[in-house]
Curated annotation (Swiss-Prot):
Subunit structure comment from the entry: Homomultimer; in vitro and presumably in vivo. Interacts with viral RNA and Pr55Gag precursor; these interactions mediate Vif incorporation into the virion. Interacts with the viral reverse transcriptase. Forms cullin-5-RING E3 ubiquitin-protein ligase complex (ECS complex) by interacting with host CUL5, RBX2, elongin BC complex (ELOB and ELOC) and CBFB/CBF-beta. Within the ECS complex, Vif interacts directly with host CUL5, ELOC and APOBEC (APOBEC3F and APOBEC3G) substrates.
Entry protein name: Virion infectivity factor
Native source species: Human immunodeficiency virus type 1 group M subtype B (isolate HXB2) (HIV-1)
Residue numbers marked as site, Cleavage in virion (by viral protease): L150, A151
Domain of life: Viruses
GO molecular function: identical protein binding; lipid binding; metal ion binding; protein-macromolecule adaptor activity; RNA binding; ubiquitin-like ligase-substrate adaptor activity
Pfam families cross-referenced by the UniProt entry: Vif
Segments for region (Membrane association): 171-172
Compartments it resides in: Host cytoplasm; Host cell membrane; Virion
Start-end of Basic residues biased regions: 176-186
Length: 192
């Protein structure tokens, strides 16, 4: 029988970022209770030797599975050190990989309070609304002018510790373009 290869997208992440993310997930599962229904699988519960952990996040009748890996081939930089993360959306027998931004949006659909567009309508009708969004990572678009105006009136409350963002977990903090000052010293430009 010949070898069968399965190719997966694995985001290279440094070890400390993975540790921080796991810690945030466990805190919100066991202490704050904001991640009710999430399931954390340790490395010793997995039959695969390269899997460091898995977090299963129920999304209705589907689920999001964030798997962290160790012992992979090192990346192009010394600090990659063979650590990585894959993000998978599963429903029954179907599964597909998703990017970190979409994962954060899916999580936000089901978890964490949000001051959303519906809050504007509720406020006009005199109903009590949640005055802030607890999970800013789930928003990657600019809101309506009404939403921005109402959101500007209410200062967001800082949540300690922050909620676990998949985008934050997979972002490349070393290869971001360096910001330099413009001609007058006040404007910023991205590497130009």
């Amino acid at each position: 029988m010949e070898n069968r290869w399965q190719v997966m997208i694995v985001w290279q992440v440094d070890r400390m970022r993975i540790r921080t993310w796991k810690s945030l997930v466990k805190h919100h599962m066991y202490v704050s209770g904001k991640a009710r229904g999430w399931f954390y699988r340790h490395h010793y519960e997995s039959p695969h030797p390269r899997i460091s952990s898995e977090v299963h996040i129920p999304l209705g009748d589907a689920r999001l599975v964030i798997t962290t890996y160790w012992g992979l081939h090192t990346g192009e930089r010394d600090w990659h050190l063979g650590q990585g993360v894959s993000i998978e959306w599963r429903k029954k027998r179907y599964s597909t990989q998703v990017d970190p931004e979409l994962a954060d949006q899916l999580i936000h659909l089901y978890y964490f309070d949000c001051f959303s567009d519906s809050a504007i309508r509720k406020a006009l009708l005199g109903h009590i609304v949640s005055p802030r969004c607890e999970y800013q990572a789930g928003h990657n678009k600019v809101g309506s002018l009404q939403y921005l105006a109402l959101a500007a009136l209410i200062t967001p409350k800082k949540i300690k510790p922050p909620l676990p963002s998949v985008t934050k977990l997979t972002e490349d903090r070393w290869n971001k373009p360096q910001k330099t000052k413009g001609h007058r010293g006040s404007h910023t430009m991205n590497g130009h």
